[in-house]
Regions:
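Core catalytic lobe of class I
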Residues: 1-232, 237-239
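Conserved phosphoryl-transfer catalytic core
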Residues: 53-59, 247-260
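A general structural signal for short secondary-structure junctions and capping/turn motifs
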Residues: 130-132, 159-162, 303-307, 313-318, ...
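Compositionally biased, charged N-terminal/linker segments
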Residues: 257-321, 329-332
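Short mixed-charge
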Residues: 1-4, 253-261, 340-341
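Conserved SAM-binding loop
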Residues: 242-243
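Aromatic- and Lys/Arg-enriched surface recognition patch
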Residues: 320-350
Length: 350
């Protein structure tokens, strides 16, 4: 064991994941794996206005198809040994490795449940004029035992998707700056992605294992959501970064701030419901100006997280004659005084 937190909810091992997994006695509920994509082939990509190398390290260097299959089969078999009979595994990839992962999972007796498409809402432009921009990654979700009933929080996923069935295409942003305050990893996954995975497939108190832990995003998300974490990685530098991130959320203010941020979906649309008298409502529609009182008194609106996603306004008069309007620009609003509104023909009473 390389590290164990004071609360025993964050355990790290340093070494080859295949070897460490064979020595583990414990059984885990869910595995999240972000194995090498084998993308490091000497190529480049555009970042900002610069052309930078895509090489992540020796561990990500391109291999032959036979070597990729052999590598994936070995670590997947090792994972199967520590997974509970009704447990599930999530594996990330791109077209470079995901087909091999799917084949090896099936060959090892796993049953594929879903293949999630993570569509990045802020993809990095890809160098070249002969192909579409690479903006998606894929996540295979599979269960160990084809006959066992796995856990899926169906109701919560519907709730998170506005009452509709959660689709298998997830539009989520890449890693935000607020996730890199302790440092960063070249293939770091966003906490919001792990939030959805963990909430969908685990219960509070469950144990999640990551055989390619890196900077321990899985562990941070797990602990923020009252799950236990076991992580394995060969890099001492990244394990130290993971420990730093764990210690960062020991601060209560930081813990609750992060807990709130990972549950937010920047792509979610906010609708403001606004009451207006009949004459005021007609004037709002005619002028294209909608106003509402901001503050903390009765009948006013507080500016809260999510307001920046405001895209629609629902106008009504005493709950009747409801009309929905789309803003010209998402999240755009101005603070006007009573005098400014009067110049536009309105007569606000406060």
């Amino acid at each position: 064991m390389y590290y164990q937190s004071d609360d025993n909810k964050f355990v790290l091992y340093k070494g080859d994941s295949k070897e460490v997994l064979r020595q583990l006695d414990s059984k885990v509920d869910v595995i999240f794996a972000d194995p090498p994509y084998f993308l490091s082939n000497g190529g480049s990509k555009i970042q900002g206005n610069s052309l930078i190398s895509v090489n992540k390290g020796d561990w990500d260097k391109a291999k032959s198809p036979e070597d990729v299959d052999a590598f994936n089969k070995e670590w997947i078999e090792a994972c199967k040994g520590v997974l509970k009979d009704d447990g599930t595994i999530w594996v990330c990839g791109t077209f470079h490795n995901i087909y091999s992962v799917e084949k090896c999972l099936k060959d090892s007796g796993f049953r594929i449940i879903n293949i999630i498409t993570w569509q990045k809402s802020d993809p990095t432009p890809t160098w070249g004029e002969l192909h579409f921009n690479f903006s998606s990654e894929y996540i295979i979700w599979a269960r160990k035992n084809p006959r066992a009933k796995h856990y899926f929080n169906y109701d919560l996923m519907k709730q998170m998707n506005g009452g509709a069935l959660m689709p298998d295409v997830w539009k989520l942003p890449s890693v935000g700056f607020w996730e890199k305050t302790c440092g960063k990893h070249p293939t770091q996954k966003p906490l919001r992605l792990l939030y959805r995975i963990i909430m969908a497939s685990t219960r509070p108190g469950d144990t999640i294992l990551d055989p390619f832990a890196g900077s321990c995003t899985t562990g941070v998300a797990a602990n923020l959501l009252d799950r236990k974490f076991i992580g394995i990685d060969q890099s001492e530098a990244y394990l130290k970064l993971g420990i730093k991130r764990k210690l960062d959320i020991k601060n209560k203010d930081r813990f609750f701030q992060m807990q709130k941020q990972i549950a937010e979906n920047p792509e979610e649309v906010t609708v403001v419901v606004n009451y207006a008298r009949k004459d005021t409502k007609e004037k709002m529609i005619r002028t294209g100006i909608c106003y509402l009182r901001a503050g903390e008194s009765t009948g006013s609106m507080c500016i809260t997280p999510g307001f920046e996603r405001m895209e629609y306004v629902l106008l009504h008069t005493n709950g009747e004659n409801c009309q929905l309007f789309k803003l010209e620009q998402k999240g755009a609003f101005q603070i006007w005084t009573k005098e400014t509104l009067e110049k536009h023909g309105f007569t606000p009473s406060h």
